[in-house]
């Protein structure tokens, strides 16, 4: 082992595993959290089911006049919240179908089918939030989401205005399947993050260098004006052709005045901002 290390240090570093070395860049990559297939973020459901009223009765007994005279303990037996869960699912399903059905007896159109599936999907999603290990409901929910997505695909192909209308009524987002699947790998992600880091570093250094040059503009122009005046005086005294004209010197002085005014305005703006931040 020592012999291999000596060879690697002496000659070409072909024995050193440089790909396994830790980078000095302060870049940390975290694998994106996997979203379950039954979550609303994946299924496309933008809204949840409305909360159930505490005094909501079973649909069959809403118009029963005898319940108005009955005792509270008797009324509680006919409340929807005190009965089986499938009755609540049926209640939500019927209410959602009423919003999209074409007529009172419409239960077989594409809109009614999508409303039924959406109500059941959202009920199952609420169940999975409370019981995430329920495998049977998870499988049913996944199959129902895929079936609804297939129906939406067909409706989008057949009647696009009706497709948009049903999405608006049911608070859905249609997510078509991707054309190709792309794996998220650590290597590719680190390459992209490194490119972004290098680009930001380059921009920061260029900005710092630009500010440094801007800070040197006024001293540079002052020194340049002095030198131009000196060169002009020497050329006149030596009786040689004058290359530095008064117009050049005047232009440099005007540029110097503009830079000083700009610097004063920036200083006033920065001081005003600091005062406002201090008051806040």
Swiss-Prot record:
Tissue expression summary: Expressed in anterior and posterior midgut primordia in stage 11 embryos. In stage 13 embryos, expression is high in the developing midgut and hindgut. In stage 16 embryos, expression is elevated in the midgut, hindgut, and in a small region that will give rise to pharyngeal muscles and to the stomatogastric nervous system. In larvae, expression is predominant in the gut, and head, presumably in pharyngeal muscles.
InterPro entries linked to this entry: Ribosomal_uS15, Ribosomal_uS15_bac-type, uS15_NS1_RNA-bd_sf, uS15_ribosomal
UniProt note: phenotype after gene disruption: Mutants exhibit a strong systemic growth defect and die before reaching wild-type size.
GO cellular component, one term: mitochondrion
SUPFAM superfamilies noted in UniProt: S15/NS1 RNA-binding domain
Protein localization: Mitochondrion
Classification via Gene3D superfamilies: S15/NS1, RNA-binding
Superkingdom field: Eukaryota
Keywords, ordered alphabetically: Mitochondrion, Ribonucleoprotein, Ribosomal protein, Transit peptide
Matches recorded under CDD domains: Ribosomal_S15p_S13e
GO biological process: mitochondrial translation; regulation of growth
Family: Belongs to the universal ribosomal protein uS15 family.
Function: Essential for gut mitochondrial activity. Might be involved in tissue specific growth factor production.
HAMAP family reported for this sequence: Ribosomal_uS15_B
Protein name: Small ribosomal subunit protein uS15m
Organism: Drosophila melanogaster (Fruit fly)
